[in-house]
Amino acid sequence: MSLTINSAFDGGNIRVIGQDGGKVDLEIVNDHQSDFYQWFYFRVAGLGGGERVTFRILNAAGSAYPFGWPGYQARASVDRVDWRMIPTRYENGVLEFDWSGDAQVAWFAYFAPFTMEMHADLIARIARRPGVAHRELGLSLDGQPIDAFTLGSGAKQVWLYAR
């Protein structure tokens, strides 16, 4: 079995440590300019035929939230639109999940990704709505716009941010 694993795309994050047959050893890479890590997202090509592949994230115990791994389920997709949870094990500091689908290419992630392209679509959609005022607060360290919306005129203010 010849697998190709890649994370060189928006939000992608994984390091391949080694592959031995149907077992792939991986590590989560630190967040940008940070000592912390938790997020993973990668693509695997060369799958299919129903052969089982076991992915093992060897450094899960050192992640930012290791107590979140027990009971956690990784996400998988064959089209990057529909994501499903797959059975995942956490034992002795290693996060492990199996894949045996028929698709030749699949993506795996900590949670269903929300890419910058999806973010831009959301900003465009909300900015067009009646009663919504948009303003750009500035730029992030990566040069991305920091958008703000004002809705309503009540006394209470709520700030939400996620990415």
Question: What is each model feature region?
Answer:
Residues 1-162:
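Structured catalytic-domain cores with a bias toward divalent-metal coordination
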